Amino acid sequence: YVGRRMRKKDILVSLFIDPDADQVEAAKRVRAGSIELNTGPYSEASSIDAKNQHLVQLRKAAMQAHDLGLRVFAGHGLTTDNVPAIIHNVPWIEELNIGHHIVSRSIYIGMEQSVKDMINCIQV
């Protein structure tokens, strides 16, 4: 109901959700135009196996959302170390939200270099 009312007023609706099929379906039901997949568990995973399991979940959720006509974004805890795997494994993502890592690194290497490094990771 809220999503429908907001869209009638030309307000774009995007929901931050876990990469879960039920949550993707719910986003479509409330007429969100886009979702942002929570990459926090992927970013915090300590083993390669756990990271790979989270990548599979992200991939499935992104594909499902794309197939339902939702735009797909992702973010939370993304860094220059973990972004390349997202780029290579989850092609339906249109936008990554990475601000904290870029700003934090800029303290040590400068904003320009921090941004360049992230761009290089994304363009791999």
Name what the model sees in each region.
Residues 16, 54, 75-76, 107:
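Glycine- and other small-residue-rich loops at beta-strand/loop junctions that grip anionic moieties
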Residues 2, 11-64:
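Histidine/lysine/aspartate-rich catalytic loop segments that bind and position anionic ligands
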Residues 57, 63-71, 78, 82:
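Active-site-adjacent C-terminal substructures of enzyme catalytic domains
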Residues 10-14, 33-36, 69-73, 77, ...:
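Structural preference for beta-strand elements that scaffold enzyme active sites
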Residues 20-30, 74, 78-93:
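Catalytic cores of alpha/beta
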